[in-house]
Amino acid sequence: MLFSHIVFVALSVFGLVQAIPSPLAKEGVVERATNADVTGVLNTLKGRTDTILPQINALVASGNVNDRNVKPLFDQLSSALKTADASLGKFKAQGSLAGKTRTRSLLLVPTSSRTSTPLSRRSPSTSR
């Protein structure tokens, strides 16, 4: 009886130690690489929009705005935004591990001496 209590306590302590989150290796390196890539995409987008938006502003200021001269500029702007969105979507798909922790846990569920089925899997009608 005492042995079973000691084993239970030892396994519980082991389970608690395993449940403590451990930081992933080289967090900072992953974060810097991801930030550099995102910054590169945003700088490219800014460079493209810095050439398109002044043209749109000049058309608006001159009062010479019509579909024929504005549509190509909006198409260029839309293309730049779609390209940036696609580039940023790749980062989302890869996932960033920076700043996150991985948890490992061991769930200890007490079992009855009459059955080897864990309590969480017993049907509601099963008595203890």
Curated annotation (Swiss-Prot):
Keywords: Signal. This is Fruiting body differentiation protein 16. Plays a role in the regulation of fruiting body development. The gene is FVFD16. The keyword Signal applies. Residues 1-19 form the signal peptide. Induction: Expression is negatively regulated by the basidioma development repressor lfc1. Expression is positively regulated by the cross-pathway control WD-repeat protein 2 (CPC2) during fruiting body development. The lineage of its organism: Eukaryota, Fungi, Dikarya, Basidiomycota, Agaricomycotina.
